[in-house]
Design a protein with these regions (language model features):
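Helix-turn-helix
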Residues: 15, 19, 23-57, 61-62
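Short acidic/histidine-centered micro-motifs embedded in hydrophobic/aromatic stretches
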Residues: 65, 110-114, 129, 163, ...
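Hydrophobic alpha-helical connector segments
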Residues: 75-106, 157-164, 209, 216-219
Length: 219
């Protein structure tokens, strides 16, 4: 039997992972058998084991690929945030996170499967140390905001930015995956504006808020 090329192996593994993902999302990890995956991928059960020793190895490979994509997407998003604490940038963050949720719904469904069936073993690093990560990314911007007197007394900018990030994520996850159907009784546009205002008014000093209000009126 001729040896498969690396490209042929990659194609075959992609087919297997696509089949597995379909089953995992539809019926969960533990309810899916290797036989189910082999049948949908149109490979023999024995051949399937040539590519993956276990079902969890398939699950982990799917998640690793998604995490790489998500990491790249989030880096692109953060690169577009000039001033992380200003209203226009917070709203832009919300818009881009909404697009991310809508474009990659399979990823979030697999995350919930991981929470239910593996106690979030495979996705834990996505949230572990999140505030510290944002502090590293935006350290200079946060410090500049402090020095300008833009922040309310006692506000920790990295913590607030993390809270805003998670709130935008949660809003779109509820709408996309849980049938929220305007669960805040607002359209997406109105929800983005409302969440932005909640955090902006909680973060910014009175002087900075007055500056933004003045620019909004003049604009």
């Amino acid at each position: 039997m001729p040896k498969l090329s690396n490209n042929a192996i990659k194609i075959r593994k992609t087919t297997i992972e696509d089949a597995a993902r379909e089953h995992f999302i539809k019926q969960g990890f533990h309810a899916t058998s290797m036989r189910d995956i082999a049948k949908t991928a149109e490979v023999s059960l024995g051949n399937l084991y040539n590519y993956y020793a276990t079902k969890e190895a398939i699950f982990e490979s799917i998640i690793d690929s998604y995490l790489t994509v998500m990491d790249d997407k989030l880096r692109e998003i953060f690169a577009q945030i000039d001033e992380p604490l200003e209203p226009s940038n917070l709203r832009k963050l919300g818009e881009m996170l909404g697009e991310l949720v809508n474009q990659h719904s399979d990823f979030w469904l697999l995350m919930y499967i991981d929470v239910l069936e593996f106690q979030n073993r495979h996705f834990r690093n996505m949230f572990d140390g999140l505030t510290d990560r944002f502090q590293r990314v935006f350290a200079d911007k946060f410090e500049e905001a402090r020095l300008r007197g833009d922040l309310r007394t006692g506000v920790e900018p990295a913590s607030v930015f993390t809270a805003a990030y998670m709130q935008f994520f949660n809003y779109f996850l509820v709408e996309k995956l849980f049938g929220g159907n305007q669960h805040l009784n607002l359209t997406d546009e109105q929800a983005l504006n409302s969440i932005t205002k909640i955090f902006a008014y909680g973060i910014l000093s009175e002087a900075k808020l007055a500056e933004f209000k003045k620019s909004a009126i003049n604009g």
